[in-house]
Amino acid sequence: MSGNGTGRRGRAVVFDYGNVLYAWEPHGALAGRRPARVWEEFVTEGGFPRWNEMADAGVPFGDILAALGRAHPDRPDWAELLADYWRHFPDTLTGPIPGVGAVVDDLLDAGVRLYALTNFNHELFAAFGRPRVPRLERFSGIVVSGRERLTKPDPAVFRVLLERHGLRGADALFVDDAPANIAAAASLGMDTHLFRGAGRLRADLTDRGLLDAPVD
């Protein structure tokens, strides 16, 4: 892979949002409002991951609450808990991932095209997610699962990104913190980086010729 500007302009890096660009801590919505054990019970026994995935897939909030009520008619408090989670959703977004903003800036300055592919409810993303990362306005494209009604690791949502923006899998590096999503991207021929911090990401991007090595 070329490390010069021409080679870089032929490449693209695709970023996940949650816990790659910006920290997402779901318990933050209810911290200080409900006991921790109440939240933990909802996650493990009330099926929070399932309901959250439905929201990420663009299912209307009212429909999700109705489905939760049907699944657990003896626990109306869980529906109230989920409604509170959405009401206080901004408190789940706890800050930029250290060092990643500088990596993004350096990639943009190097002429690398950047994209985002995120599992995120489209309404919550527009209201709270996107405004917290102003650098997204310099990205060449953003695919939000809720708008597409497809979620990672379904390969179909990766195809949406590639086809919509005229990308070849071989020309794109996908950065995500979830191994299942990394595997899905790799199955489509994309290069991948399992995110474990900005330092490792920068080193990998440098090895790939997308960033210059630091000057001693």
Region annotations inferred by a language model:
Residues 1-13, 117, 121-122, 126-216:
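Asp-based, Mg2+/Mn2+-dependent phosphohydrolase catalytic module
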Residues 2-48:
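Active-site neighborhood of HAD-like aspartate-dependent phosphohydrolases
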Residues 16-19, 58, 107, 116, ...:
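Generic structural signal for small/hydrophobic residues in well-ordered secondary structure
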Residues 25-26, 99, 197:
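Acidic donor-diphosphate engagement hotspot in glycosyltransferases and nucleotidyltransferases
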Residues 29-30, 65-69, 85-90, 124-129:
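Hydrophobic alpha-helical core bundles mediating ligand binding, dimerization, or RNAP-core interactions
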Residues 52-85:
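A metal-dependent, Asp-based hydrolase signature
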Residues 80, 84-115, 155:
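Short, acidic loop-to-helix structural element flanking the phosphoryl-transfer center
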